[in-house]
Amino acid sequence: ERNSPVVLIVEDDNDMRSLLCDELWGEGYQLREAKDGDEALQAVLQSIPDLILTDLKMPAGGFDYITRLKTFAPNCPIVLMTAFGGAKTKADALRWGASAYFDKPVRIGDLKEAVRKLLANKLVKEG
């Protein structure tokens, strides 16, 4: 029996973080939480998750934070969410190493589908 994938949810808004946890818990993932970029980096240094779902605009966030995540966890897919998006932000996000990008308010169904696909692809690559 394979262990269920570990998803790190990084979001400074408590209500949004709770909602994301509730939705992804229902998918059977093991969840870890962080409320800002620093907490997220510490969590990744302790143990690399299978996927990181993160806000962009939060304390210790931004594209330099995404770059640091990719340095510590180069093979970990990163799903980025932001309320301050647009075409340029999306292009930047993908260039800086995000695997998927969502504008807020996020459509939960689309988000769960992206998480499912990225985790499936990662399992295939890792064999």
What are these regions (language model features)?
Residues 1-8, 109-127:
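Non-catalytic signal-transmission and effector/linker regions of two-component phosphorelay proteins
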Residues 13-32:
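Two-component/phosphorelay signaling modules centered on CheY-like receiver
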Residues 33-51:
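Acidic, metal-coordinating helix/loop segments flanking the phosphotransfer/catalytic sites
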Residues 42, 63-75:
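Short amphipathic alpha-helix used as the core "switch/output" element in two-component signaling
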Residues 52, 78, 101-102:
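Two-component signal transduction core modules
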Residues 55-65:
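Conserved phosphotransfer microenvironments
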Residues 64, 85-102, 113:
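Alpha4 helix (beta4-alpha4-beta5 surface) of REC/receiver domains from two-component response regulators
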